[in-house]
Regions:
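Catalytic or ion-coupling anion/metal-binding cores of large enzyme and transporter domains
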Residues: 1-180
């Protein structure tokens, strides 16, 4: 795998052996038997990867979108923010019949990252409110993480996280957000 990534790596970086990464990789490259499982960069399974790094006003240091699980119709969309300030707030209000939420709103979970969580709980997969029964997907934004098997248009690992003063913490109910 490292041989395939060699052109993208800092070959001057020291390894635990005391050798540089370049020295470790300075061996003849043999086409391994697993090459059909871990594909070379010049022969990918798909043209584009499953993950996309996003940067913008809410994520100046980046965020992750699992493009392969996102709804294409939501990739370029705009919506009203419905904000949950913590995991406890989310648990208490997500299924409240009086929650002011519509299918085209963006659900935002703040303070669920490594410090705000604390400890990076697997909480980024915000459920769709029960009052929106039948809605299959919504844009969801969080500084948390989620399972790799989850699906939907979910933007995760927003950095810097809200708990350390990241801009995600400034979002309020009713703010207009745009994903593009």
């Amino acid at each position: 795998v490292l041989q395939e990534l060699k052109l993208l790596l800092n070959l001057e970086a020291l390894t635990v052996t005391g050798k540089t990464l370049g020295e470790v990789l300075d061996v003849p490259y043999v086409w391994p038997a697993w090459q059909n499982v871990i594909r070379p960069a010049n022969n990918p399974l798909q043209e584009e990867g499953a993950l996309v790094v996003l940067k913008g006003n809410l994520a100046p240091d980046g965020a992750i979108l699992k493009r392969s699980a996102a709804s294409a119709s939501m990739i370029n969309s705009r919506g009203r923010a419905v904000v949950f300030t913590s995991l406890q707030d989310l648990a208490q209000r997500i299924d409240d019949p009086n929650l002011d939420v519509k299918a085209d709103d963006f659900l935002v979970l703040q303070n669920a990252g490594p410090i705000g969580g604390p400890g990076m709980p697997e909480a980024g997969y915000l459920p769709i409110p029960k009052k929106l029964t039948g809605v299959k997907d919504m844009v969801r934004i969080s500084d948390a993480r989620m399972s790799g098997t989850a699906f939907g248009t979910v933007i995760l690992h927003v950095s810097p996280e809200a708990a350390v003063g990241g801009p995600l913490g400034l979002v309020r109910n009713g703010d207009t957000l745009e994903l593009s």
